A protein has these predicted regions:
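Conserved phosphate-handling catalytic cores of large alpha/beta enzymes
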Residues: 3-96, 258
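Hydrophobic helix-and-loop "lid/oligomerization" segment in the mid-to-C-terminal part
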Residues: 1, 20-21, 38, 71-292, ...
Length: 312
C-alpha cells in the first residue's frame, strides 16, 4: 500500500496491515504525532529529524519524489516528467506556498499542461485562447477535480485524469461539470447559513449544523475566513460525531490551536493553515470554549487584522 497525502496518523490501520503481511509506504506532508506509524517507509519532510531542506511540498509532490527516485534507480528520470501537470495542479489546489521547489514544479507542470493537455483537462480549458496560467488551475481545473470527491466519488476525477480517449474523457468531464454546479449550490447554502451562526464578539468562528454537506465544509470555512478574518471551523453531524474542516488566517497556526485541545477530540490532522477534525457531541462545547480561549490568548487579546502586501 502506498498512501498519498494521508497515513501519518494511521497507526492502527498500518499495524493491521503489518499483521496481514502488507508493506505500507506513507507519502504525507501533514504534521506527525509523537508516535508515528510502523510503516515500511515514511516519506514526510515534516517529521522530526528529517533533514530534507524544503518542507512545503504537498502530498502529491511527495508521491512524485517517490516515483522519481524509483525511476532514477532504474536508470532514467524523463519518464516521470509527464506527470508534472498533475503535481502542479495538486500544488496549486492545495494552496502550497509558491516558493522554492514548488515554483519549479508549477512552472514545468504548466508547460506539460499547455503543450499536451490530458483530454479531460482539455474539456475545461478549451475555451481559453491563451497559455494556461496558475489562476486557471485555482479557479477552473482545481475546483472541478475536487467537486466529484466532495459530492460523489473521487474515482470519477481519477478516471478523468487517466482516460486517453477524448470522447470518453469529455463524457466524464461533463459529469464532473454537472457535479461542480451542485457543489457550488451546496457551498452557497452552507456558507449563508454558517454566516448567520457567527458571533462578532468572538476571536474565532466555530459553527455547526446537523445537515450540512460534508463535502463543502472546507470551502465554507475558507469563505468565512475571507469575510471575517478569524480562525474558523465548520462542522456537520454524522452518527453523533461532529466532523469538519478548519481554516486559518495568515501567520496563525491553526493546527497547533487544535492540537492544544486534543483531549476533546476523536481525531484530527492537518497543517498550519488547514486541518480536519472530529468531535463527539458531548465534547463539542468544551472544545469550542478551549479553542476560543487559546486563540484569544495567542493573539494578545487583539482581533486579527488583514494585511495587504504590495510592491514599492
Amino acid at each position: 500500500i502506498i498512501t498519498i497525502d494521508c497515513g501519518i496518523k494511521a497507526n492502527e490501520q498500518i499495524e493491521s496491515a503489518n499483521e496481514k503481511g502488507i508493506d505500507v509506504i506513507i507519502c504525507d506532508h501533514h504534521i506527525p504525532d509523537n508516535s508515528i506509524p510502523k510503516a515500511y517507509s515514511i516519506i514526510n519532510p515534516n517529521q522530526k529529524n528529517c533533514n530534507y531542506p524544503f518542507k512545503g511540498l504537498c502530498g502529491c509532490g511527495i508521491g512524485f519524489k517517490l516515483i522519481s527516485a524509483i525511476e532514477k534507480k532504474s536508470g532514467g528520470i524523463e519518464e516521470v516528467n509527464q506527470y508534472l501537470d498533475l503535481v502542479a495542479i495538486a500544488t496549486i489546489a492545495d494552496q502550497m506556498p509558491m516558493i522554492n521547489e514548488n515554483r519549479a514544479i508549477v512552472k514545468y507542470g504548466l508547460k506539460v499542461l499547455n503543450k499536451n493537455p490530458r483530454p479531460g483537462f482539455h474539456f475545461f480549458i478549451r475555451s481559453i485562447n491563451r497559455e494556461i496560467v496558475e489562476s486557471d488551475i485555482s479557479f477552473n481545473i482545481g475546483p472541478r477535480i475536487n467537486a466529484s470527491g466532495r459530492m460523489k466519488s473521487g474515482m470519477i476525477s481519477v478516471e478523468l485524469m487517466t482516460e486517453t480517449n477524448t470522447n470518453k474523457a469529455y463524457k466524464i468531464a461533463q459529469e464532473i461539470e454537472s457535479t461542480n454546479l451542485l457543489r457550488r449550490a451546496k457551498e452557497k447554502e452552507v456558507t449563508e447559513e454558517a454566516i448567520k451562526k457567527t458571533d462578532p464578539l468572538k476571536f474565532t468562528n466555530v459553527v455547526y449544523a446537523a445537515d450540512w454537506n460534508k463535502g463543502v465544509l472546507g470551502i465554507a470555512a475558507s469563505r468565512l475566513v475571507d469575510k471575517f478574518y478569524k480562525p474558523t471551523i465548520v462542522l456537520t453531524l454524522e452518527n453523533k460525531i461532529y466532523t469538519g474542516s478548519a481554516r486559518s488566517v495568515a501567520n496563525f497556526d491553526i493546527y497547533d490551536a487544535i492540537d492544544s485541545g486534543k483531549k476533546y477530540l476523536d481525531q484530527y490532522g492537518g497543517h498550519k493553515y488547514a486541518a480536519g477534525l472530529s468531535i463527539k457531541q458531548e465534547n463539542l462545547q468544551g472544545f469550542i470554549d478551549h479553542f476560543e480561549s487559546y486563540v484569544k490568548n495567542a493573539v494578545g487579546n487583539k482581533m486579527f487584522a488583514k494585511t495587504i502586501s504590495y510592491d514599492i
